[in-house]
Every structure is written in structure tokens, then in C-alpha cells.
Regions:
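Enzymes that bind and transform nitrogen-containing heteroaromatic metabolites
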Residues: 10, 51, 118-342
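Hydrophobic beta-strand positions
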Residues: 1-2, 124
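Active-site beta-strand termini and strand-to-loop segments that position acidic
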Residues: 2-4, 113-114, 332-333
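Short capping loops/turns at secondary-structure boundaries
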Residues: 74, 78, 94-97, 112-116, ...
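Zn2+-dependent cytidine deaminase-like catalytic core
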Residues: 2-100, 187, 212, 273-275
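Generic structural signal for well-ordered alpha-helical scaffold segments
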Residues: 27-31, 60, 109, 151, ...
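Proteins enriched for Cys/Gly/acidic motifs involved in redox and nucleic-acid/cofactor modification
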Residues: 82, 96-124
Length: 342
């Protein structure tokens, strides 16, 4: 938010679904200094009442003179903000740094356009692509700095997904721990075709209403009743050819829940299922300079491909060092930031 002299007097971002939008935060910070100024937004200000009031009403009420928009809102329900602002006599400039805006909002844009979440696969691996030793020892392959970056990724996603094998082996909490989104609890999704998740698992004992256990028709009635009594959300979805939860149906279901960004943390079979379904949009692999070898667990299993022509191709977008570890970020070529947006 710029005042009439071009000085920055406010800024904001949309921290959580259902919470105030970025414009509201920026205008609240600016107060009366916003009148007659310019507000710069990434997506077009919303024009419809949903979980929050329309942002265009807040902008009009604040006496803003000019609005600069990077990308139009593709949602036909929420769009129309530009037209509304112009009808009120406010100057609107569109398409400024639109490519940067698209990259910044590509997870949200995927959900708006396809009504499915953007899927990010995350793993900590050795140089030879292993996520555990042959005995199952996996804590810790990467160092503390890499693990902290992994926790940041949880803050950027609406839900965390693992398979029941990870629950049985590691009993993870699958929580946000950095406090970057206060009041916004991440959803926890467990793929468990036969409902083997035990009632004493942390994801069941702690905030069970935030846990979704997804199974197929193969689950026994007593296990359905057991988890229902524990208070978790349980949903049956179709099975694929391997009698596991069909990934396309899962993404449709999560999209209907409003989950726009899904972080898939494994294990190997779960990662394999998502790659087999060509459902992974983004990859974060944290690589430690070690060799495990032998029959240790690989990062991605599943069915795989028969030829290199069939391999899933991605674009290397960024790489960062975390002490001795290397963070590699890849996206689909069509979603890549090929121009280096800043």
C-alpha cells in the first residue's frame, strides 16, 4: 500500500483460508494514510461476499485512487473486482508483472481452475536416492537446517499427506510448529486402504478432527467403527488397479474440501502412487551427502515407467544449500518460472 507520495505505508498477505485477505491487512496497517494512494495486489480484488466481505468494498471505502493488479481472478464467482472498481471511478492498471504474479499464486490458481489441490512431493534422501536404511532407520538423513525448511513447507500448504506405513513406522505428529499461521490448523491426510491406523497414533489422539483417514471398500467394518469412535474424519474412495486409494478421486475430494495445496511427505509407495498418476506438480528433495546402498528404501517406488520417453519430466527451478545438504525444487515445465521472477 502506497500513500499519495509513493511511500510504503502498509502490506499484507492472505494467511489462511477464511481469514482476511491481503488487501484488508495492508489497508488496516496504513490507516488514514491510504486515502488517495495506490494499492498493489497480486490477484484481482474479490468482488463477492464469501467467508470474508468483498475486498473491493474495503478498497472503495478507504478512498484509494489507483489499484495495480498483476493477474485477473479466474474464478467466475469471485472475479469482477476490476470492473467494479472502475465503475466507482478508481483507476485500475492490469497485467503489471503478471508472470511473477502467476508464479507466486500458482498453487491457488491450480485449485481455482481445476478444483484440485496443487500437489507438492517432499522427501529427505541420500545421494543414492534412499529415504531409510534396509532396517528402516531414517532419523535423520538430513540435518537440522533442512528439517527446518521442511517445516516451512508445511506452513505453505493446507494439508499434509502420508501413508499408513509412515504412521506405523514413525508415528508422526504432522503439525505446523513455526507459528507462521496462528489459528490455522493444517489438515492431516492418511492414505490407509484397509484402515490399519491404530487408535493410539498421535494423528488420532491429538486433534482427531483435523485428521482425514482415506480408505477403500476393503476396510473391515470393525475398523471403520473403531476410527469413527475416535473422532477422525473417515472417507471411503474408489481403489485403483493395485487396490489402493485412487489418486484422482482423492484430489477431487480434497479439492471439494477447499484444500488448495497438498504436501505429500511419503513414504515411497505413496510418492510412487502420486507419480504414477502424474499428479505431482512440485518436488522438494533435500539431498544429504551420504550413500546408504543395499536394499534400502528408495524415495519413489510404485509401478514406474517402462521407457525413458514415459518418464515424468520436471524443470529445476531452484537449489539451496542447508549446511551440507542440498534443497532441490522442481516443477512441471508448464508451471516453471523460466524467467526468474523475483
Amino acid at each position: 500500500m502506497l500513500d499519495p507520495d509513493g511511500l510504503v505505508v502498509g502490506e499484507g498477505y492472505h494467511a489462511r483460508c477464511g481469514g482476511p485477505h491481503a488487501e484488508v491487512h495492508a489497508l488496516a496497517q496504513a490507516g488514514g494514510r491510504a486515502r488517495g494512494g495506490t494499492i498493489l495486489v497480486t490477484p484481482e480484488p474479490c468482488a463477492h461476499p464469501g467467508r470474508t466481505p468483498p475486498c473491493v468494498d474495503v478498497i472503495i471505502g478507504a478512498g484509494i485512487r489507483r489499484v495495480v493488479v498483476a493477474v485477473k481472478d479466474p474464478n467466475p464467482i469471485a472475479s469482477g473486482g476490476v470492473e467494479r472498481l472502475r465503475a466507482e471511478g478508481i483507476e485500475v492498471t492490469e497485467g503489471v508483472r503478471s508472470e511473477s504474479g502467476r508464479i507466486l499464486n500458482r498453487r491457488w490458481l491450480r485449485w481455482v481452475q481445476d478444483h484440485r489441490p496443487w500437489v507438492t512431493a517432499k522427501a529427505a534422501i541420500s545421494l543414492d536416492g534412499r529415504i531409510a536404511t534396509r532396517t528402516g532407520d531414517s532419523q535423520w538423513i538430513t540435518g537440522e537446517a533442512s528439517r527446518s525448511r521442511g517445516l516451512e513447507l508445511r506452513e505453505e500448504h493446507d494439508a499434509i499427506l502420508v501413508g499408513v506405513g509412515t504412521v506405523l513406522a514413525d508415528n508422526p505428529r504432522l503439525t505446523r510448529r513455526l507459528g507462521l499461521n496462528p489459528g490455522d490448523d493444517v489438515r492431516r491426510v492418511i492414505l490407509d486402504s484397509r484402515l490399519r491406523t491404530p487408535n493410539d497414533a498421535v494423528v488420532v489422539q491429538s486433534d482427531p478432527e483435523q485428521t482425514i483417514v482415506v480408505h477403500t471398500s476393503a476396510a473391515a467394518r470393525e475398523d471403520r467403527e473403531r476410527l469413527d469412535a475416535a473422532g477422525v474424519e473417515r472417507v471411503e474412495l474408489p481403489a485403483d488397479e493395485r487396490d489402493r486409494v485412487e489418486i484422482g478421486s482423492l484430489l477431487d475430494y480434497l479439492g471439494d474440501l477447499g484444500i488448495a495445496a497438498l504436501l505429500v511427505e511419503g513414504g515411497a509407495e505413496i510418492h510412487g502412487s502420486f507419480f504414477d498418476a502424474d499428479a505431482v506438480d512440485e518436488i522438494f528433495f533435500f539431498v544429504a551427502p551420504m550413500i546408504i546402498g543395499g536394499e534400502a528404501t528408495v524415495a519413489v517406488s510404485g509401478i514406474g515407467v517402462a521407457t525413458l520417453e514415459m518418464a515424468r519430466r520436471y524443470h529445476f527451478e531452484e537449489g539451496h544449500h542447508h549446511d551440507d545438504d542440498l534443497e532441490l525444487q522442481c516443477v512441471r515445465p508448464e508451471d516453471a518460472d523460466v524467467h526468474g521472477s523475483d
